[in-house]
Amino acid sequence: MHELGIVFHIIRTVEDVARQNDVTRIRRVTLQLGEVSGVVESYLQDCWKWAAAKSKLLPGAVLTVETIPAVTVCEDCGQQYPTVQFGRTCPHCQSPRTHLLQGHEMLIKEIEAVETEPTAPERA
């Protein structure tokens, strides 16, 4: 299960960004995940819940996953098509000379911080 390693990497990245921006708590992390990335979302969510609970910045933080559809382009006819539906062979011209345009990526799209109450200025 490589999802745990992926979650650890996401958490390290989020914690680094939080420190750079003086954020003390994270509410939500939105991840864009390619349809053919090889990551199983349910495993990713289970690993996230376990690992986030152990982080000082992330207890209770939600991981939202947006799926990026896999799209392939044919080098012979130039047509684009849905990868999962048609595979590696172009449905337009039956050419095997195709390559994946999108759908393999994994990107942190958004980090939502918990707003902290501003401290009142001290009175003299």
Q: PLM features: residue spans?
A:
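Long, charge-rich boundary regions
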Residues: 2, 20, 106-124
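Cys/His-enriched microdomains
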Residues: 72, 88, 106
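Long, charged N-terminal interaction/targeting segments
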Residues: 1-61
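Short cysteine-rich clusters marking metal-coordination/redox-active sites
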Residues: 74-77, 90-93
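Short, conserved loop-to-beta-strand elements that form functional interface hotspots
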Residues: 58-68, 91-94
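Short loop/turn motifs enriched for small/polar and acidic residues
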Residues: 32-36, 66-70, 109-111
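Short functional micro-motifs and their immediate structural scaffolds
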Residues: 82, 95-99
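Short, flexible, mixed-charge glycine/proline-rich loop motifs
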Residues: 62-69, 79-85
